């Protein structure tokens, strides 16, 4: 990539701009010195200035209700444009395909994509010779928790995951919890050898099985934002790793990192840890 491209602020489309995460992304992109808000897409308040909607003052960027119209315009720009998607599991797959089709680089924080959908998007990005980033969690603290869990798994055979989120989250278990279990499974170890013949008096009482026989328990309550515990057990001891999100600003360093790096990639990568 040329020095001119690297020195020019990165133009960013935010899809789901009025959502809880989208609002924070708009603010972060607006405030960062090397990024510039190109467009804001949402189904609500179409035509209203996104800056006024978020209390940032007039930005002269009206909220668009059509991602396709925005991508058509972005395809005409001299420098590649990045799209950040924090929308809904039912919308994100087509959003990413559309972005790639128009040469817009996707950064995705929306969870709920199936493994098959992720594989299809990876193939689509490969054919376009474009980079894309999908990360179930953009918190650097969560990446560190997963790294600590990988290390701990060398010494513990029993582990379960509890993830807790606000009650507006549509998918369960969370993409972060699934990714945590998958990263532990990639060690080639099967956890939680059975000790007794279990029976559930209420279906699902013991959680859901993820990779490597790791159970995940999901909690949805108002007052929560995003929290995860990885609990290891052994005779005479419990080892608990926990990450708590108290403000969605914690995700912004990771989002900005992905925005800055995605145009340098030639394939889809899954997980923020691959950029660190």
Swiss-Prot record:
List the cysteine pairs that form cystine. Answer: none
What GO CC terms are in its UniProt record?
cytosol
Name of the protein: 4-hydroxy-tetrahydrodipicolinate reductase
* Pathways per UniProt: Amino-acid biosynthesis; L-lysine biosynthesis via DAP pathway; (S)-tetrahydrodipicolinate from L-aspartate: step 4/4
**Taxonomic path:** Bacteria, Bacillati, Cyanobacteriota, Cyanophyceae, Acaryochloridales
- Quote the InterPro entries the UniProt record gives: DapB_C, DapB_N, DapB_N_CS, DHDPR_bac, NAD(P)-bd_dom_sf
The protein's job, in short, is:
Catalyzes the conversion of 4-hydroxy-tetrahydrodipicolinate (HTPA) to tetrahydrodipicolinate.
Cite a single Pfam family from the UniProt record. DapB_N
């Amino acid at each position: 990539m040329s020095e001119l491209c690297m020195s020019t602020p990165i133009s960013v489309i935010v899809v789901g701009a009025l959502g809880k995460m989208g609002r924070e992304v708009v603010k972060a992109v607006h405030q960062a010195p090397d990024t510039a808000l190109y467009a804001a897409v949402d189904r609500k308040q179409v035509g209203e200035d996104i800056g006024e909607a978020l209390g940032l003052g007039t930005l002269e960027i009206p909220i668009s209700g059509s991602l396709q119209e925005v991508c058509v315009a972005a395809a005409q720009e001299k420098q590649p444009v990045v799209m950040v998607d924090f929308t809904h599991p039912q919308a994100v797959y087509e959003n990413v395909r559309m972005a790639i089709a128009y040469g817009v680089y996707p950064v995705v924080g929306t969870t709920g994509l199936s493994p098959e959908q992720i594989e299809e998007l990876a193939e689509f990005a490969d054919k376009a010779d474009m980079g894309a980033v999908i990360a179930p969690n953009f918190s650097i603290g969560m990446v560190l928790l997963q790294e600590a869990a990988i290390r701990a798994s060398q010494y513990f055979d029993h582990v379960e995951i509890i993830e807790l989120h606000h009650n507006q989250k549509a998918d369960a278990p969370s993409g972060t919890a699934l990714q945590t279990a998958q990263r532990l499974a990639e060690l080639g170890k099967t956890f939680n050898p059975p000790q007794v013949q279990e029976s559930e008096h209420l279906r699902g009482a013991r959680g859901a099985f993820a990779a490597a026989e790791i159970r995940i328990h999901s909690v949805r309550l108002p007052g929560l934002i995003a929290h995860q515990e990885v609990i290891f057990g052994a005779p005479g001891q419990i080892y608990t790793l926990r990450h708590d999100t108290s403000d969605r600003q914690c995700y912004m360093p990771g989002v900005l990192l992905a925005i800055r790096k995605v145009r340098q990639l030639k394939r889809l990568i899954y997980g923020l840890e691959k950029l660190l």
